[in-house]
Amino acid sequence: MDELLIQDPEVGRAIVQEVERQTGKLELIASENFVSPAVRAAQGSVLTHKYAEGYPGKRYYGGCEFVDVAENLAIDRACEIFGAQYANVQPHSGSQANMAVYFSALTPGDTILAMDLSHGGHLTHGSPVNFSGRFYNVVFYGVSRETGCIDYDSVAELAREHRPAMIVAGASAYSRIIDFARFRAIADEVGSLLMVDMAHIAGLVAAGLHPSPVGTAHFTTTTTHKTLRGPRGGMILSDEEAAKKLNSQIFPGIQGGPLMHVIAAKAVAFGEALRPEFGAYQKQVVANAAKLAATLTDAGFELVSGGTDNHLMLVDLTNKDITGKDAQHALDLAGITANKNTVPFETRSPFVTSGIRLGTPALTTRGMKEAEMVKVAGWIIDALGNIGNETRLAEISRDVEKFARQFPLFHW
């Protein structure tokens, strides 16, 4: 960092300020996490210099013998973690992993049945502003108005009516266990392929705390950050039968040279996921989410589906007459980072929203447990009760900073 501050003080100062933000605030964005020093070391290594188009043993460039080692380790460890026959670790993101699956199995104009974004889905699951919504005919399923949980009977009815070429399961803001076996049964009934995007829950799946889609779905995609606690990137898991098509869709289909420094960092993170400590960490993530959810519920906050089974919760602020936008801003002033989020059957725009999404992976990585979640919930409640009161929000922020700095960014 000293060298960077000398060579490029503007970028260096921005990074120093970001370190201060991360250490002095409470990170509750459900899709964010903190990686280990080992993962950061791999990602910042000389592997960033190397072009390696192709796959291990079949490169279009020379000098790839050592990056091949890194990629093979990432592949082997991913397959071991999830019990998969095949893994492609080259996708630069979860979005590109999803794109490769679509391109390998579908034709433009085919019908996809996927979860509505406002009910907890993802942009790449058919949103009209995304490539997936432009290339394919998308039919959406959602959650029950009564329970806030996926309405599997409705999914089955929609599948029978529309006969989709592919059903997509997985979400970015859904707090309950997803029944992948039920999705596969529906897919089989109508002759559809099933893709599961487990980006948010991959770490829980790795630790056996959520049913695995691998072996149930035809294709499983994920990011490698979030609960999996690796570098930002994507991955595809499937069987040997699909390998050739998937490989060719990643390269040369939608990507050129893979990011070998990121792939090495993925290998390191996957190695960490095979350690017993990783399972203990994931259990704590779930326990922390349950405690945070229960404390907020006891204070009169309404959670979509009534609670959480995983690492996140979706707080519906309608009964508090607070918008997600205002809540996010107030929390930020109080030293707590979260994101506004649409809720099922949303009445406000995506730029305003009626909810906020909260997650515990990052705080758990810092070493926080249930007792700390009660404190965090107290500050959230205080901040949301003082929207517009900048004096009180500043006081909360000072308390939050003093508390947060007691914890390192990464703790086993």
Swiss-Prot record:
Protein name: Serine hydroxymethyltransferase
Function: Catalyzes the reversible interconversion of serine and glycine with tetrahydrofolate (THF) serving as the one-carbon carrier. This reaction serves as the major source of one-carbon groups required for the biosynthesis of purines, thymidylate, methionine, and other important biomolecules. Also exhibits THF-independent aldolase activity toward beta-hydroxyamino acids, producing glycine and aldehydes, via a retro-aldol mechanism.
Gene: glyA
Superkingdom, natural source: Bacteria
Pfam family, one: SHMT
Site (Plays an important role in substrate specificity): 225
KW Amino-acid biosynthesis (keyword) present: yes
Pathway the protein takes part in: One-carbon metabolism; tetrahydrofolate interconversion; Amino-acid biosynthesis; glycine biosynthesis; glycine from L-serine: step 1/1
Localization annotation: Cytoplasm
Residues annotated to bind (6S)-5,6,7,8-tetrahydrofolate: 117, 121-123, 349-351
Native organism: Oleidesulfovibrio alaskensis (strain ATCC BAA-1058 / DSM 17464 / G20)
SUPFAM superfamilies: PLP-dependent transferases
Residue numbers bearing the N6-(pyridoxal phosphate)lysine modification: 226
EC number: 2.1.2.1
Annotated keywords: Amino-acid biosynthesis, Cytoplasm, One-carbon metabolism, Pyridoxal phosphate, Transferase
Primary localization: cytoplasm
UniProt keyword Cytoplasm, yes or no: yes
An MF annotation (GO) of this entry: glycine hydroxymethyltransferase activity
